[in-house]
Each structure stands twice: as C-alpha cells, then as structure tokens.
C-alpha cells in the first residue's frame, strides 16, 4: 500500500513538473532568449533578424561571422538588443494609447518600395523596422504635444530633448532579463 502511494505521488509530482516546464515555454525548439517587461523574445524571433543581416552582408560582399564564434555571439546579441528596443517601444506605445496597425505598416512598406503588395510578412525585419518607426513617430507626437517655443529651431530642440528624456526613462524603467549567453556587451 505504501509503495502504491509512493508511486502515485511520484507520478503526480512528475506530471506537475512536466506541465510546469511545458507551460513556461520549455521542452520545445523555441526557447526564450530575453524578457522585456515579462514579454518573451524567442529564438524564432531572433533568427530571422540574424538571417536578414547575414543576407545583407552577403549581398554587400562583406563577411558575416560564423555561427558559434565569439564574433557571431556579439552580433547576435546586438541584434537581440534591437528586438528588445522594439519591444520597449511597443509597450510604451500601448501605455500611451498609441498604435500602428498592420495596414499602416504595410502601406508604409509599399510606399517606400520595400515590399510588393502581399509581400510584407508580419515577422519580417522590414516590417518590424517600419512598425517601430511608426510607433516612435506617434510616441513623439504624444509626449511632445504640449511643447511650445518662440522659434521652429527651438521647438524642434525642445521636442527632441523631451522625446530623448522619455525614451531614456522607458529604457531605465523597463525590466529586461536576458537568458544566459544572450546579454549584449561591449
């Protein structure tokens, strides 16, 4: 009887541990590489950005570091920092009540000649770049709306300072946690 209870208890504990691992995102091929304010950035989000820059380097006839090398890890981690920045922008925009819709992003992509109709993919590097730019424009408009100045030059300078202060505060106050081996460095 005691052996049976022990076996049942072991099965229950084992199932709970397995469920916990699966619910936390472990046990699959898309590990979290960083968390921004609790929002995960996964390997499947990072890989296309790395691939984009690998292809850009190849198109320009420039070398790209080999996978697994120290130089590759430095480049990969800097690109992860870009994804962290974009996530911080999306979170800040949401707090301010501003957004960029998928339609707006695709229109901007098509207007810039970066994409053909139907070509813009939600997870593409170009899509993320345009989305971040639209969000930054809207964040800027929101946080600088009440600023006044005697000249256009002074107005631009005051707005730039206000936006810089806001973005510095966002970066300072947003909790970012990198998984081991992924933190950007010097």
Language model: regions and residue ranges:
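Short, low-structural-confidence N-terminal segments
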Residues: 1-74, 160-186
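Basic side chains
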Residues: 4-5, 76, 86, 138, ...
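Proteins with a high burden of low-complexity, intrinsically disordered sequence enriched in S/T/G/P/A and R
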Residues: 8, 115-119, 123, 150, ...
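Hydrophobic membrane-targeting alpha-helices
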Residues: 18-22, 92, 142
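A ubiquitous, low-specificity "background" feature that marks scattered single residues
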Residues: 20-21, 110, 132-137
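N-terminal targeting/tethering segments
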Residues: 27-130
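Acidic/polar surface patches and capping/hinge elements
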Residues: 121-125, 130, 137-181
